[in-house]
């Protein structure tokens, strides 16, 4: 089952945290969930070239706190904070609530699966060979300190008549190990032959349990 399920969702509550942190009753839950989706689509659409990895949302009363994780914080903030202020105003109008935006910088973009996937997708759109794009991405990620990476592209590769999927990997990616810090990201490339899907798994090492389990391990 570990081969099929989303590796991030499988680890939520174990070593990963939720991207949306709020509570709502049955009456409001669906509306707030759709609002979260609209916020993420708006942010990702507006900051398409800013290497945005994820958008975290927290709610308190009539206030929405949004944390944008990006490899290019300067592009998100803009000159004198103009871009982030324009984004905040547009989100205020979209939600009808007070919106506060935090920017979190991603120090190593090559270890972020979403950004690696987007990088490959952009190269495919620029007619670079999918094999070359994947192998270069693998080299950069392993050089950045990853323990393993698995890549997959699927669609009409190289303009072929029949769609297929191709995989490349290096190192280990233990999908069944819950303490393994595995990042997963997807992207789509719009080519002249149609869409090509990109999936990336990056294994960044094990996250050790934080609660006192050493005694139990020593006892065994």
From Swiss-Prot:
Gene3D superfamilies in alphabetical order: 3.30.300.20, Ribosomal protein S3, C-terminal domain (3.30.1140.32)
Claim: Ribonucleoprotein is one of the keywords in the record: yes
Recorded superkingdom: Bacteria
A GO MF label: rRNA binding
GO cellular component: cytosolic small ribosomal subunit
GO terms, biological process: translation
Keyword set, alphabetical order: Ribonucleoprotein, Ribosomal protein, RNA-binding, rRNA-binding
InterPro entries found in the cross-reference section: KH_dom, KH_dom-like_a/b, KH_dom_type_2, KH_sf_prok-type, Ribosomal_S3_C_sf, Ribosomal_uS3_bac-typ, Ribosomal_uS3_C, Ribosomal_uS3_CS
Phosphoprotein as UniProt keyword: no
Limits of the KH type-2 domain: 39-107
PROSITE patterns for this protein: KH_TYPE_2, RIBOSOMAL_S3
Family named by the database record: Belongs to the universal ribosomal protein uS3 family.
Function per UniProt: Binds the lower part of the 30S subunit head. Binds mRNA in the 70S ribosome, positioning it for translation.
Subunit structure: Part of the 30S ribosomal subunit. Forms a tight complex with proteins S10 and S14.
Official protein name in the record: Small ribosomal subunit protein uS3
Organism listed in the record: Shouchella clausii (strain KSM-K16)
